[in-house]
A protein has these predicted regions:
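Basic- and aromatic-enriched surface patches that contact anionic nucleotides/nucleic acids
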Residues: 2-37, 41-211
Length: 211
């Protein structure tokens, strides 16, 4: 009997969507989320640089033997029938879900001015507590665009989400400045955003015959 259903890499954005839709959940015995935001930030830097960032182990849970719960920050399970239990990789996936979906105790931003100036990605990303006045003020698009601060949650829509945000930001400027900003943001998209959008994580899926 083959315990492995498959070992194929999965697109990160698809894995995060599964968490949001409660297709992938946690066994209730898993420990709570404990990662520091600095660790989340380092993980996002690795992904933007297409570095290995660990694998995911999950099991198809057709029998639903174990009590399950949603990932921290995801919508409540509320009777939703899940497909997978994530056995290893919880901390990484929770941190990425919260960062890209804009939930949890911290918010993550990219300073696009720094990226335009050629600064490395790790120097351009930062986090703040979601409860601060500063973070709440930057829920406003006009302020984001004025300061060229991109909430990482925009990227849950992948490169398309970034494209929509950047076009909307550039349209606020006159022709010459608009074209210059569009060109600069296109370079950021091709160098960094597309890498995040294309990122795949190794996933080992155990079959529902696993005991």
């Amino acid at each position: 009997m083959n315990l492995f259903e498959d070992t194929n890499p999965r697109a990160l954005k698809d894995l995060l969507t599964e968490i949001h839709n409660r297709v992938a959940v946690l066994p209730d015995f898993q420990r709570d989320f404990v990662w520091e935001p600095s660790a989340t930030q380092e993980l996002i830097v690795s992904i933007a640089n297409n570095y290995p960032a660990g694998s995911i182990l999950r099991v198809r849970d057709a029998k639903r033997v174990f009590a399950a719960r949603e990932f921290e920050g995801a919508p409540p399970l509320d009777g939703t029938k899940h497909t997978f239990l994530v056995l290893d990789g919880q901390q990484r996936m929770t941190s990425l879900y919260q960062a890209f979906y804009g939930v949890g105790e911290h918010r993550y931003f990219l300073d696009l001015n720094k990226l335009i100036d050629g600064t490395d990605f790790e120097e351009a990303i930062f986090h703040v507590r979601a409860s601060t006045k500063w973070a709440k003020a930057r829920e406003d698009f006009d302020l984001q665009a004025d300061e060229l601060l991109l909430p990482l949650s925009v990227l849950k829509g992948g490169a398309g989400g970034f494209g929509q945000w950047s076009r909307k930001a550039a349209r606020r400027l006159d022709n010459e400045k608009r074209i210059k900003l569009e060109d600069a943001l296109d370079l950021i998209e091709s160098k960094w955003i597309q890498a995040i959008d294309d990122y795949h994580s190794p996933v080992v899926t155990l079959s529902d015959k696993t005991e």
